[in-house]
């Protein structure tokens, strides 16, 4: 591993693995079939984004991840680099057409003028789409 540690995966808790999985597949992820862990009873799905995996874990029967039980802060946003302004525009349009909320339509932001859009996934997690 050169250059230090690399992010291997990020886990998101959800009440709807199937709905959240469909949203991230629309962003280009390759999804495993959702399955249920025999030991914990938690339903989960792994989404592959090239070198980083996004694990979706469905909360069932009042189960809460340890981070929530401890009152720890959560995720601020997930960021996805799409490669072009046209890709940001197209995906933002597709996300809106699918009924998901667009917080900020595509625009140039910040002093560097980075082209981005900010949307919400079905669970309300903030997702930033950039070039």
Predicted regions and their residues:
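Short beta-strand/turn micro-motifs at beta-sheet edges
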Residues: 62-68
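A generic structural micro-feature
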Residues: 2, 39, 69-72
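Core segments of cupin and vicinal oxygen chelate
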Residues: 13-54, 60
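Exposed loop/turn and edge beta-strand positions of beta-sandwich/beta-sheet ligand-binding modules
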Residues: 6, 41-43, 74, 113
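N-terminal beta-strand motif that seeds the catalytic metal site of vicinal oxygen chelate
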Residues: 1-21, 33, 75-80
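Short amphipathic alpha-helices within nucleic acid-binding modules
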Residues: 86-91
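Vicinal oxygen chelate
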Residues: 1-3, 45-46, 92-131
């Amino acid at each position: 591993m050169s250059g230090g540690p690399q992010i291997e995966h990020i886990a998101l808790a959800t009440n709807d693995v199937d709905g959240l999985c469909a949203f991230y597949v629309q962003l280009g992820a390759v999804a495993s079939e959702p399955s249920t862990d025999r030991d914990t009873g938690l339903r989960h799905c792994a989404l592959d984004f090239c070198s980083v995996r996004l694990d979706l874990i469905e909360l069932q029967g009042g189960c809460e991840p340890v981070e929530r039980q401890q009152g720890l802060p959560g995720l601020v946003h997930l960021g996805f680099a799409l490669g072009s302004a046209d890709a940001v525009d197209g995906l933002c349009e597709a996300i809106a057409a699918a009924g998901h909320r667009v917080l900020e339509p595509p625009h140039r932001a910040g002093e560097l003028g980075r082209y981005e859009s900010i949307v919400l996934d079905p669970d309300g997690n903030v997702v930033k789409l950039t070039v």
